[in-house]
C-alpha cells in the first residue's frame, strides 16, 4: 500500500494550479444519463472517484471518451471527457459498484426521470431510519415516484412520469438538491425546492442542465424553481474550480509559511474560509486568475469556527483548519455541525504532538510551539490531507499510510506541493 513521506520545515513558494471540483464533476457526469446526446465536460479532475463513477456509468451503457490534450495541458490541468447515454442497457446500479462511492446513488434520479424505473443499491453502511439517502427518497416521492426498499436496494418506479411538486427540505442537503434538480428537469409541470442547498456545485449543475435545455431559476438561493421539459439535449460545460482544494493549499501555506499563487480558481467560492485565514495572520489577495496566499514570519492567531452549509465555513475544510490551529498561539474552538464522526483525524494529529480535546461536536485545540514528525494513518479523504498539511510544518519526517484516501479527492498532490519546495514523495508499495 502506498505511503507518503514528508520532511517538514520547508516553506512553500511558487504556483499551484487548482483542478476542477470533484464535487461538481460527479453530479455533472451523472446528469449525462438525462439525455441520449453527448455531454462534454471540460476540466474534469483525474481522481479515483471520477474513475469509479465512469465504471458505474459504463455499467448502465454510457459511452465514455477522453478527448486528447489541448496544447499546454498537463496531467495537472484536468481532462475533457465526453459521455453519451444513447444506449442505456441497464437501470440497475449494483451494490458492488455503488458501495465504492456514495454519490453514485444519485443515478437513481436521471434513470427514474428518463426511463421510468431505477433499482439502485443503498450505499454501504446505511441503517434503516438513519440513512443519509432518506431526504433524496423523500424528494423523489414528492415528485410522484413509487419507492420501496427491497433487499438493500431502492426500487423506484413511475407509471406516467414524474410530476412537479413543492419540496421543502427539513434541512439543507446537497445530495437531495442535486437529485431533485435532475429529476424535476424532466418532470411534468413546475417544481419548487424550498431550503435548497446553495453550494457552488449546485449552481454549476443547474447551469449545465440549463445548457442542456432545462428551465431552472434561483440556483444559489434557498428557493429554486424548475419547469420540467420533455427532453434534454447534449451540451458542453466546464467544471468550476475546486474550492476545497483551493482552501486546502491556502491553509498549507498559512501553516508552513511562504508565498504561493493558487491559479485558475475564484475567491467568491470560499469567502468564509479565506476571511478566517486572514484572521489567523495569512495575507490573502486576489490576483488575475487566482488567489495569492502569503505568510512570512509572525505567529498563527487562534480563531474559532463553526462549520455550516454554504456560504458558511465548509465542513470539508474543517480537518485542514484544525491542523493549522495546532500551531496557533492560544486556544481555538472548532464546532462540527454538518457530519457526525468527523474528528477521526484528531488522534493522528495528536501523534504529531497536537493537543486537542473533544467535547461532543466541539474540538478544543491548544496551540503548541512545534509538531514533530511521526508515522500516521489516514482515516478518510479530508483527514488524510490534514495530516499532509501538519507534516509540512512538523519537524523531521512524517510518514502517512493509507494514502489511497488522498487519491479520491486531490489531483497530483505531491507534484503540486513538490514544485513549491515541499519535501514530499510517494513511496509505492
Curated annotation (Swiss-Prot):
Pfam families linked to this entry: EPSP_synthase
Binding site for phosphoenolpyruvate: 22-23
Domain of life the protein comes from: Bacteria
EC number in record: 2.5.1.7
Family statement: Belongs to the EPSP synthase family. MurA subfamily.
Sorted UniProt keywords: Cell cycle, Cell division, Cell shape, Cell wall biogenesis/degradation, Cytoplasm, Peptidoglycan synthesis, Pyruvate, Transferase
Function in brief: Cell wall formation. Adds enolpyruvyl to UDP-N-acetylglucosamine.
MF (Gene Ontology): UDP-N-acetylglucosamine 1-carboxyvinyltransferase activity
InterPro entries named among the record's database cross-references: Enolpyruvate_Tfrase_dom, Enolpyruvate_Tfrase_sf, MurA_subfamily, RNA3'P_cycl/enolpyr_Trfase_a/b, UDP_GlcNAc_COvinyl_MurA
Ranges in coiled-coil conformation: none
CDD domains per the UniProt record, alphabetical: UdpNAET
UniProt cross-references to Gene3D superfamilies, sorted A to Z: Enolpyruvate transferase domain
Reactions the enzyme catalyzes: phosphoenolpyruvate + UDP-N-acetyl-alpha-D-glucosamine = UDP-N-acetyl-3-O-(1-carboxyvinyl)-alpha-D-glucosamine + phosphate
EC class of the enzyme, as a word: transferase
Signal peptide: none
GO terms under biological process: cell division; cell wall organization; peptidoglycan biosynthetic process; regulation of cell shape; UDP-N-acetylgalactosamine biosynthetic process
Modified residues (2-(S-cysteinyl)pyruvic acid O-phosphothioketal): 126
Listed SUPFAM superfamilies: EPT/RTPC-like (SSF55205)
GO cellular component term, pick one: cytoplasm
NCBIfam families: murA, PRK09369.1
Protein's UniProt name: UDP-N-acetylglucosamine 1-carboxyvinyltransferase
Transmembrane stretches, start-end: none
First-listed, main subcellular location of the protein, grouped into a coarse class: cytoplasm
Catalytic site positions: 126 (proton donor)
Location(s), subcellular: Cytoplasm
